Every structure is written in C-alpha cells, then in structure tokens.
Amino acid sequence: MSIQVMMQMLGQGFLVSLQLFVLTLLGSIPLGIPVAFMRMSKIAPLRWIARIYISVMRGTPLMLQMFAIYFAPYYVFGISLTPDSKWTACVVAFIINYAGYFAEIYRSGLQSIPRGQYEAAEVLGYSRMQTFLYIVMPQVAKRILPAMGNEIITLVKDTSLAFAIGVGEMFSTAKALVASQVSMVPFAISALIYWVFNFVVEMLLGAAEKKLDYYHD
C-alpha cells in the first residue's frame, strides 16, 4: 500500500478524531459552568452532588467511563446496542469527563478573585450581572486559560481512547494499517498528525493569552 493511500485513510480517521474533539469542547465547556456554581453553592445537597460528580469524573479512567456508558443501557435496561451506540457513548463519556475537569478550573478561577472587587463594583453602582461580566469574567478568563489549554491539549491525545469501544478514529485506523501492512509507518504518520494538530492548538491558545494581556494581575 502506498504512503498516499495510507495518508488518505488516516486523514479520514483524523476527521472522526476532530469531530470528537470539537463535540467534546462544545459540550463540556458550557456544562462545566453550572457544575462549578453547584460546587460553590451554599446549598449543601447541590454542593455535594457536584463534589461527587467531579471526584468520580477525575478519579476514574475515561476508558472505564466509556465502557460503562456504552454497556449500561443493555445490562441495566435491556436496550439493544446499535452501531451508533458506540459513537454516542464515546461523545457522552468525553463530555461529562471533561466537564468535571473544567468545572474545577472554573471554580478555582472564580474563587481567586478578591471579594473586595465585588464590593468596589457595588459601590460604583454596578449590578451583580455587570460586575460578573465586565470585572470578574475578564480576570477569570486570563487566570484559567493556561489550565484550560492543558486540558484541551490532553483532549487531542485522549481522542485516541475511542478505539477501545470500536470507534473508527485515527489511532484505530493506524493500528489496523500496522497489522495489515506489517509496517510502523502508519503509526509514524498518525503521530505526526497528532503533533501538528496539537501545535496548531497551542498557537491558538497562545494567541488567546496574548489577547488577554491587557489585564495585569
């Protein structure tokens, strides 16, 4: 098999990895916000639900979570598994897993803002919403961006875990090609693609950090 054909097949697998990457961010970034506020809530049941959720998501392997979500409908409810079940379970597992990590990042960022800034904004006539949007959020965004960036870069590599439940992403394609062609070239090509994609993500995150440099702690 020629290198061109291998790259074409790996490219198709990469599109699946990219789709998983994008869907995970679109789902987990907003989901982490209410979880973070629950984690900081004065209502004890909400606070404990969030703490347990975050602890489970961070304390158990993502691969195990994928298997649990994939097989639970069958073993618990007797629902038959379909070919689409693998993809759905994979996306759901990635979203709820990363939401747990993002929630803790949001919480640490919000709690790092001195209480005096809220009080000063109130004296100046700002509403709670105005204080949050115009004073708190710009500072929080800058403070949490490096940690968010680390998780996003990790996500690029974690998409390869989808092969465990049979999702045809780039790593599973490379693994199949290595077995059929008896060659390490597919692994080398896929490693290069992962690195290039991560490099692009790092550049975008770096640009975002520079854009937020207008605020200095």
Which ranges hold each PLM region?
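Transmembrane alpha-helices and adjacent helix-loop boundaries
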Residues: M1-D217
